[in-house]
């Protein structure tokens, strides 16, 4: 589930076809509605409508019922090619269709599909007839707002989402998965576990990390730094803003301006907050002259960048306007490229394994039609990337012509505990910026040469990765990442002295531990409370534990471990942390 569908696949055709059936049902139930577009998408389909009156999710069952009535007709889906003039007449009362037609290229073939009483402007493809659509295998799932053509200056339409599968069994499996996804939604758990918040009155897409969330983030970042030092990287810190000439030179103002925040005018100069870290790292490189003996440079930064995401695209910590990229740039010679790419891929695999992600999938994107750089360099880079994937036994697909105009790349996806693929690591050659910024080094023969530059992000963005971690573990983080690892729960005040001794011993060993001496709550209620907060271990201390000098442990998974010596309990927890174990 969740993989992108090929247009020729039967499921793609079914989803496209059911979207037309939904549009017909809506028009029968709400006759003055104007229709926009209705494509198949990952896991389902949608259609955008301009309703005369407000509708809600309460209307979805009514629409579903009408759709099933239409399906009973078994009507065919008939494709016709028409002229531009015919299309303008046919859809004269549909302003959104007219807008589409008027923006077609004059050479475009215009096709329509007819089914039952409905005709739509559509390229297809579709199933042959409605008998191919199982009436028990689809469900309308939600309604959301969507701007026409995705432009916030246009009217907001009502987008009805649905899902369709080959049979009822697959539908039920999908809906069950969606229920689990809802339970694990990082926005929901973020509130329940007090991890982070968003304040639209301050600014949409800007994340406020609360103490527990900030603790997890700090643990991620500290681990990231330690691993980079172990792997021969140097850490950089660069500014958040730069003058316009920098972004003109890099090409961002020519090709990326729509995703950048507006300029800031001061001191008779224009500044922009940075959308990427690359030009700043190059500025550091160009501070000095370099010899081939100096290379490679492996420079990494947890650099905060800012991108003007549309309001409708913002989503929790996953899609934001201010975020921290775990960027690195490797600057090296031709002879060093093969080793450096292999090392980056090895580092990425190791990093993901330590965070609990062992199922990886890669995509290798090659040279597009329009590209900069030498053909030989492109061929070499693609071969190096492909060989690294093969050597590390990573399953990969080749996206022919799918590379950026400035270089080929590997995109590495992780598969989470719910089977969803998340694009995370990128290893990207850049044949553009070294030329734009005139980067050079002195080769062994004394001549000036252009270095190779490899962009590299492992986690992608810290904020997005944080959200993925929350959902992957359902908030029940591995012990090493848990913001609170242990809670001591004494049964009464009589045993507090021993409980405080345990607290001190564990604190001195760096364990994140809390002492709960609130006695107005029953013991079982306390345990349930901390289990709901996903705390890994609760130390229950009663009079027996005091007499024997031992500890009883209740885990968040409700496992009971009795009679551990204090030293044993300490070693038990420390081992779980050092091994990065998952409960």
UniProtKB/Swiss-Prot annotation:
InterPro entries: aa-tRNA-synt_IIb (IPR002314), aa-tRNA-synth_II (IPR006195), aa-tRNA-synth_II/BPL/LPL (IPR045864), Anticodon-bd (IPR004154), Anticodon-bd_dom_sf (IPR036621), Thr-tRNA-ligase_IIa (IPR002320), Thr/Ala-tRNA-synth_IIc_edit (IPR018163), ThrRS_anticodon (IPR047246). Its cofactor is Zn(2+). Keywords: Aminoacyl-tRNA synthetase, ATP-binding, Cytoplasm, Ligase, Metal-binding, Nucleotide-binding, Protein biosynthesis, RNA-binding, tRNA-binding, Zinc. One of its GO terms (biological process) is threonyl-tRNA aminoacylation. It is an enzyme of class 6 (ligase). Binds 1 zinc ion per subunit. It is found in: Cytoplasm. Residues 185-478 are annotated as: Catalytic. Its EC number is 6.1.1.3. Disulfide bonds: none annotated. HAMAP family: Thr_tRNA_synth. Catalyzes the attachment of threonine to tRNA(Thr) in a two-step reaction: L-threonine is first activated by ATP to form Thr-AMP and then transferred to the acceptor end of tRNA(Thr). Also edits incorrectly charged L-seryl-tRNA(Thr). This is Threonine--tRNA ligase. It comes from Borrelia recurrentis (strain A1). The lineage of its organism: Bacteria, Pseudomonadati, Spirochaetota, Spirochaetia, Spirochaetales.
